Amino acid sequence: MTAILERRESENLWGRFCNWITSTENRLYIGWFGVLMIPTLLTATSVFIIAFIAAPPVDIDGIREPVSGSLLYGNNIISGAIIPTSAAIGLHFYPIWEAASVDEWLYNGGPYELIVLHFLLGVACYMGREWELSFRLGMRPWIAVAYSAPVAAATAVFLIYPIGQGSFSDGMPLGISGTFNFMIVFQAEHNILMHPFHMLGVAGVFGGSLFSAMHGSLVTSSLIRETTENESANEGYRFGQEEETYNIVAAHGYFGRLIFQYASFNNSRSLHFFLAAWPVVGIWFTALGISTMAFNLNGFNFNQSVVDSQGRVINTWADIINRANLGMEVMHERNAHNFPLDLAAIEAPATNG
């Protein structure tokens, strides 16, 4: 009898826990994805803060030349970064217990791998939590679908690209100037500016900014007057009110006359779908582009593609970009190799005598 009562009590405790986890009445929804999201994101955030402040220099290139990234080792907010895991580690799983000591783990950039893997798990669970909350509230699932774009982008630069290049040392550093360095080296090695998927991503981000500004300014300019001149126009809206707060017909008429009739949406639902879909699809393509360039399927190469009747090269903008790429490639990891791959692949000219 005692055993039965204990089992019922434990089942009741588990049931209450399940109800609490999945309750939409909590101030912040947890959900089953949140059970994994909370510890992973807390771990990633805590280690990032500690490492950004105090981590010792990391031998990123695996050539016994440590690079300092933390504030206590001479950096500021702009130059500081979590330095990627050493090329000596490659793609090996490198938790603390795999190193001979904590000093060795820090020297080889163990915190970067710890942060990145926990962060990617955390943001993936955040996306799942968005879907889970939408499901429990009877909403459609498109919030999580939209969030999949930045998740895909983060996964591309922190996981897919290192896998394709064979080492976590090629991942994006976790810092401002480190991100810029990653972008410059990526251009030098993969010619990303000439990749059509990157072009679609630029159109997505810049176009999304333009459409967001256009939509916001049109709505703000066609608000239905509910206030006097001495009050803020924002006071004319009450949360949850049934009537429209702006005149979509006026906005449609204005924009249709500014450009042409069919450039303006006359359906609020299709308009907002477009505003969401445009940047999301663009960022999807960018993430896909990073993932293909990870395996060296690079941007277009139009170098020396125009010649005159005598066979002499007429430089185009592609040749100017190529020269810049070579310059950037020569400068990065300058002590890890003598020549960039593009130059090393060219046969040395024959000499007489």
UniProtKB/Swiss-Prot annotation:
What does the entry list as the binding residues for [CaMn4O5] cluster?
A: D170, E189, H332, E333, D342, A344
EC number(s) from the headed UniProt entry: 1.10.3.9
Family, according to the entry, reads as follows: Belongs to the reaction center PufL/M/PsbA/D family.
Top-level EC class, please?
A: oxidoreductase
Q: How is it modified after translation?
A: Tyr-161 forms a radical intermediate that is referred to as redox-active TyrZ, YZ or Y-Z. C-terminally processed by CTPA; processing is essential to allow assembly of the oxygen-evolving complex and thus photosynthetic growth.
Q: Please list the residues that bind a quinone.
A: H215, S264, F265
- Where, per the database record, does this protein carry Phosphothreonine? T2
Note describing how the cofactor binds:
The D1/D2 heterodimer binds P680, chlorophylls that are the primary electron donor of PSII, and subsequent electron acceptors. It shares a non-heme iron and each subunit binds pheophytin, quinone, additional chlorophylls, carotenoids and lipids. D1 provides most of the ligands for the Mn4-Ca-O5 cluster of the oxygen-evolving complex (OEC). There is also a Cl(-1) ion associated with D1 and D2, which is required for oxygen evolution. The PSII complex binds additional chlorophylls, carotenoids and specific lipids.
Mind telling me which residues the site (Tyrosine radical intermediate) is annotated on? Y161
Known role: Photosystem II (PSII) is a light-driven water:plastoquinone oxidoreductase that uses light energy to abstract electrons from H(2)O, generating O(2) and a proton gradient subsequently used for ATP formation. It consists of a core antenna complex that captures photons, and an electron transfer chain that converts photonic excitation into a charge separation. The D1/D2 (PsbA/PsbD) reaction center heterodimer binds P680, the primary electron donor of PSII as well as several subsequent electron acceptors.
Tell me the protein's name.
Photosystem II protein D1
Site note Cleavage, residues: A344, A345
User: Which sites bind chlorophyll a PD1?
Assistant: H198
Binding of Fe cation occurs at: H215, H272
User: Which residues take part in binding pheophytin a?
Assistant: Y126
Q: Which HAMAP family match?
A: PSII_PsbA_D1
* Prodomain positions: 345-353
On the tree of life, the source organism's domain of life is: Eukaryota
